[in-house]
């Protein structure tokens, strides 16, 4: 891809430059198993993205120090908007779902990198740590009801595009994600059913150990 233009004198110069959007946005929609579920308000849940971040160069790659080492630093992204959506007329929809009520959280993050499947990139104390995890906690009990690697399961949607893209290319091309979760009551065993919707594609992670990937 062309990365520069040579401008000489007063003559017009044209060309095509490759651009990359290095920010991502996420809409987290949480639905109750039961519409009369007690305590289903935004203030009772902590939703955040925990991961690493680094300075990026003009190509979107991580800047390395004099020794060629990436300087990843821990970072936490919190919602810039959160609200309870209540059905008052019988026709409320959130991301296409007909519901009585839902919690909606909007977040953003920096560029997401494909997660390598090795110990160093999964160790949060390592400078090579390179992950972003969506973590949902019930504040009433302090229990994490969802903790999973975003690059890992969002890249699964890329496999369904039939574009032949590698995981990193898909993560770069897609800049907005909608994740829909069905949240159990605190008295349950905290097996959460998660339906992740990305541009019409649906992934189901059901009754699994969602904190291990």
Model-predicted segments: where are they?
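Short, low-hydrophobicity acidic/polar segments
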Residues: 1-24
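Short, structured patches in soluble enzyme cores that scaffold and shape functional sites
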Residues: 21, 30-32, 51
């Amino acid at each position: 891809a062309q990365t520069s233009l040579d401008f000489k004198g007063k003559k017009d110069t044209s060309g095509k430059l490759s651009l990359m959007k290095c920010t991502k946005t996420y809409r987290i929609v949480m639905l109750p198993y039961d519409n009369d579920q007690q305590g289903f308000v935004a203030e009772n849940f902590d939703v955040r993205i925990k991961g690493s971040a680094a300075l990026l160069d003009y190509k979107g790659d991580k800047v390395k120090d004099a020794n060629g080492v990436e300087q990843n630093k821990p970072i936490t992204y919190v919602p810039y908007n959160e609200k309870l959506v209540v059905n008052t007329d019988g026709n409320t929809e959130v991301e296409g779902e007909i519901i009585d009520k839902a919690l909606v959280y909007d977040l953003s993050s920096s560029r997401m990198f494909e997660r390598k499947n090795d110990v160093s990139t999964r160790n949060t104390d390592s400078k090579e740590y390179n992950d972003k995890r969506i973590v949902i906690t019930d504040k009433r009990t302090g229990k994490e009801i969802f903790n999973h690697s975003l690059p890992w399961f969002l890249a699964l949607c890329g496999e369904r595009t039939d574009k032949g893209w590698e995981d990193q290319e898909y993560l770069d091309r897609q800049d907005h994600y909608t994740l829909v979760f069905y949240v159990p009551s605190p008295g349950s065993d905290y097996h959460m059913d998660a339906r992740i919707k990305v541009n019409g594609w649906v992934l189901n992670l059901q009754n699994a150990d969602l904190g291990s990937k």
